């Protein structure tokens, strides 16, 4: 989809927009107000009511900006985050890098008995400032971080295709907020365009 727009400039707003359809607010995030997020509709809660198991994977701190509280209230049953990775694997500002996150995610998919149907969220962090990643292919630090994120997603998809789960899986790739570069002055909407990609077996 090429006509898709970010609802925010921060994860604490973008995640709520994606999962609950709640528009981002300019000065604060509803994620910080559990008494309000408890009443929001959510994709995870609807899927839970339909019998899906729900998990969330993130290499960083799931309590950052009250994210854990929101995820639990929205229906997420299991959260894998920074403290579930050895200290040696938490190399950057945002915790475990994306390739480590996807390795853990794929390992769990293969080794743990999966309750089906399932809905799993993997939140990456490498395409976020300070753009320090274990990947050195491009001179531009920001573009290099995005190339690293792409390679991690690509590696995961290639490996996941080899599993029997692939044929019944829909993968949705979507950023939670707009990118790092300044918005073009002549067409500010261009700065809010984000990809939405659907792939599967």
Task: Describe the function of each predicted region.
Residues 1-201:
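Solvent-exposed soluble domains appended to multi-pass membrane proteins
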């Amino acid at each position: 989809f090429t006509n898709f727009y970010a609802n925010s400039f921060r994860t604490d707003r973008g995640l709520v927009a994606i999962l609950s359809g709640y528009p981002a607010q300019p000065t604060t995030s509803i994620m910080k107000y559990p008494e309000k997020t408890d009443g929001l509709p959510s994709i995870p809660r609807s899927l839970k009511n339909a019998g899906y198991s729900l998990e969330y994977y993130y290499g960083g701190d799931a309590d950052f900006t009250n994210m854990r509280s929101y995820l639990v209230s929205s229906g997420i049953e299991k959260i894998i985050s920074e403290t579930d990775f050895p200290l040696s694997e938490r190399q950057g500002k945002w915790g475990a890098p994306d390739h480590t996150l996807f390795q853990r995610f794929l390992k769990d998919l293969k080794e743990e008995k999966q309750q089906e149907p399932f809905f799993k969220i993997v939140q990456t962090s490498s395409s976020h400032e300070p753009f320090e990643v274990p990947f050195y292919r491009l001179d531009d630090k920001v573009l290099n971080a995005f190339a690293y994120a792409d390679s991690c997603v690509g590696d995961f998809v290639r490996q996941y295709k080899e599993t029997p789960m692939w044929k019944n899986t829909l993968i949705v790739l979507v950023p939670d907020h707009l990118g790092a570069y300044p918005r073009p002055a002549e067409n500010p909407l261009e700065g809010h365009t984000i990809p939405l990609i659907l792939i599967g077996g």
